[in-house]
């Protein structure tokens, strides 16, 4: 959230390409957790995905035919074409997640932030999402995801950062994803859960 300028850093600053977030926001896309979204808001799948174009078009300008075509393409990439006119409140959890992934894709960003992109989705949806993320990586894009399923870290990611209040370890997954770093990260989990309850 600090990197996305949603909360202020305690100290220092966050830079992308040596620029502040406000200067490069059109190069950054964000997929939030499903739980942080009002799914009862009356809008369609197409409308939600099309909102991803507003950063390039401008909030007070009308989207062009090209923007609408790009919206259709993004919806197709996540396999949601038949749901294009469906209200988002009528979608399953996995379908909702794919809609927000499509909204990120239509932004044509360089960096993609994803907050628990696989949470609450079935294995088929998870596979389709990871296939899309791998394509982005192969296109030279950067994908940063919050992810807690230790079973899939090695399969899904090239780099890993372990955080427990502060950074425990960070680097290539084959070097950093070790039992020692996992233990350092999770050793006080039960204590912190008790403190937070």
PLM regions: where:
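Helix-to-loop junction immediately C-terminal to a conserved catalytic motif
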Residues: 4
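Conserved ABC transporter NBD signature motif
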Residues: 12-24
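Conserved ABC ATPase "signature" region
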Residues: 50, 65-83
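Conserved ABC ATPase signature
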Residues: 87-91, 95
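Catalytic Walker B motif of ABC-type/P-loop ATPase nucleotide-binding domains
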Residues: 112-115
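H-loop/switch region of ABC-family ATPase nucleotide-binding domains
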Residues: 147-148
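H-loop (His-switch) and adjacent beta-strand-loop-beta switch element
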Residues: 159-173
């Amino acid at each position: 959230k600090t990197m996305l300028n949603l909360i202020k850093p305690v100290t220092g600053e966050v830079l992308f390409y040596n620029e502040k977030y406000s200067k490069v926001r059109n190069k950054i896309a964000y997929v939030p957790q499903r739980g942080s979204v009002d799914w009862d808001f009356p809008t369609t799948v197409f409308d939600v995905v099309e909102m991803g174009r507003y950063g390039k078009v401008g909030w007070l300008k009308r989207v062009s035919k090209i923007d609408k075509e790009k919206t259709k393409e993004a919806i197709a990439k996540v396999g949601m074409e038949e749901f294009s006119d469906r209200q988002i409140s009528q979608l399953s959890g996995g379908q909702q997640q794919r809609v927000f992934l499509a909204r990120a894709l239509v932004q044509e960003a360089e960096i993609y932030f994803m907050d628990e992109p696989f949470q609450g989705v079935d294995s088929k949806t998870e596979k389709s999402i990871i296939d899309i993320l791998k394509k982005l990586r192969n296109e030279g894009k950067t994908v940063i995801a919050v992810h807690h399923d230790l079973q899939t870290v090695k399969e899904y990611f090239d780099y890993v950062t372990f955080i427990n209040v502060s950074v425990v370890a960070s680097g290539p997954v084959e070097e950093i994803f070790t039992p020692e770093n996992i233990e350092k990260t999770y050793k006080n989990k039960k204590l912190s859960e008790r403190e937070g309850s």
